[in-house]
């Protein structure tokens, strides 16, 4: 992996390890499963070390274990690196990792929690 983002080489390798894609660095996109592509997309979004992350359905195509890993990763980034992580999802399993949850109904906030 060539260094082009804002993360150090060690931080990048740690991120790839946490996402379970470190071993995929030499593969071509057409060799990846849907879930692997999703995790690569998350790594690409985090590679520039943004202060705000807007993730639209970040757990699509992921199994339950990977959903937990992504939830823990986002929660950890919010707490330790003070990042704002905004997740738009239908996957209610991610609620447990959120500080606040807003439910939308007909384009309006219908419920707040947290």
What are these regions (language model features)?
Residues 53-56:
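Catalytic Walker B motif of ABC-type/P-loop ATPase nucleotide-binding domains
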Residues 42:
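Hydrophobic anchor residue at the start of the ABC signature
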Residues 68-80:
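Helical segment within the ABC ATPase nucleotide-binding domain
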Residues 49:
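Conserved catalytic motifs of ABC-family nucleotide-binding domains
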Residues 28-32, 36:
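Conserved ABC ATPase signature
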Residues 6-24:
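Conserved ABC ATPase "signature" region
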Residues 64-66:
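Helix N-cap at the start of a conserved alpha-helix in ABC-type nucleotide-binding domains
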């Amino acid at each position: 992996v060539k260094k082009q983002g804002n993360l150090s080489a060690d931080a990048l390798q740690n991120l790839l390890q946490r996402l379970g894609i470190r071993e995929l660095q030499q593969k071509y996109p057409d060799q990846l499963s849907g879930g692997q592509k999703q995790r690569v997309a998350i790594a690409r979004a985090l590679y520039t070390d943004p202060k705000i992350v807007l993730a639209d359905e970040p757990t699509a195509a992921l199994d339950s274990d990977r959903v937990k890993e992504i939830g823990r990763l986002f929660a950890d980034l919010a707490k330790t690196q003070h990042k704002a992580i905004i997740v738009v999802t239908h996957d209610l399993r991610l609620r447990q990792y959120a500080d606040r949850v807003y439910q939308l109904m007909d384009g309006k906030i219908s419920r707040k929690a947290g």
